[in-house]
């Protein structure tokens, strides 16, 4: 079932609810930069077969969510939107444990939510989380983006990561030709995503305490595996696990071995439920 969750007069989040009878738990999915919920159909189906209900939504500025396309005013909007989705899901499913899965920028959103709201979920799963400054904005380029993104917020910047998302050519081709994928975003958006939000994480990373599974492809060219390793080493969680996948690129859930990875995620969720 697809519908819209109204946040305010200017923003309504498009979401999909794929629920099973008597779910063992619920998983809320935060997709990555430029993505939309349609790219997680196979993930949803896999979780449903394992007895897990799934809620996913197009992040602000993305997909078919009703908001300015490719733009946000502040990274804090991602945290507040995510919180509204969590409250909505919990109100609809009283007493059912809730987990959150975030990929790439969605992993950043998930991590920030975990820092800001440490008591709402049973645990989180992060896939290639973009929680630190990435190669395109290191050094002088980051300084330029910081200035341009602050002073000329509405200038558009092209999505330059398209060829590096996955080692499966069909996935890359589908991504490039997907009308719901963002192929550009504003400088203001990129500043909030690539600079301001990672600064928030760096400042508050030790406050993150959720049980967490972090998964990362060793050949990730978009978010280097060192970023995931840094997060794992610096969060305050006692219950944490890091899995590195040799030969996999950024979108591990679109690589050919994705069923095995999803099985691992399901097993981890069920393990948390037994504790």
Predicted segments — roles?
Residues 34-37, 63-93:
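Catalytic nucleophile-loop/oxyanion-hole region of alpha/beta-hydrolase
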Residues 39, 44-68:
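Conserved alpha/beta-hydrolase
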Residues 103-186:
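Alpha/beta-hydrolase-fold enzymes
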């Amino acid at each position: 079932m697809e519908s819209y969750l109204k946040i305010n007069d200017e923003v309504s989040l498009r979401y999909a609810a794929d629920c099973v009878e008597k779910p063992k738990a619920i998983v809320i999915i935060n997709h990555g930069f430029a993505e939309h919920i349609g790219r997680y159909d196979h993930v949803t189906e896999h979780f449903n077969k394992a007895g897990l209900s799934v809620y996913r939504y197009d992040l602000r500025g993305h997909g078919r969510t009703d908001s300015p396309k490719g733009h946000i005013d502040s990274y804090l909007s991602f945290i507040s939107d995510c919180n509204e989705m969590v409250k909505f899901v919990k109100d609809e499913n009283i007493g059912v444990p809730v987990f959150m899965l975030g990929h790439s920028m969605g992993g950043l959103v998930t991590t920030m939510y975990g820092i800001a709201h440490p008591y709402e979920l049973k645990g989180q799963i992060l896939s290639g989380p973009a929680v630190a400054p990435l190669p395109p904005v290191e050094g002088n380029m980051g300084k330029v983006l910081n200035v341009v993104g602050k002073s000329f917020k509405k200038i558009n910047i092209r999505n330059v990561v398209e060829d590096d998302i996955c080692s499966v050519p069909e996935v890359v081709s589908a991504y490039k030709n997907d009308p719901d994928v963002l192929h550009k975003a504003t400088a203001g958006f990129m500043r909030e995503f690539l600079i301001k939000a990672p600064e928030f994480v760096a400042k508050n990373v030790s406050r993150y305490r959720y049980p967490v599974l972090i998964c990362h492809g060793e050949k990730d060219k978009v978010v280097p595996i060192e970023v995931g390793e840094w997060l794992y080493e610096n969060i305050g969680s006692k219950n944490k696990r890091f899995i590195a996948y040799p030969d996999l690129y950024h979108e591990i859930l679109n690589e050919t071995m994705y069923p095995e990875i999803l099985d691992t995620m399901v097993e981890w969720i069920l393990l948390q439920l037994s504790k």
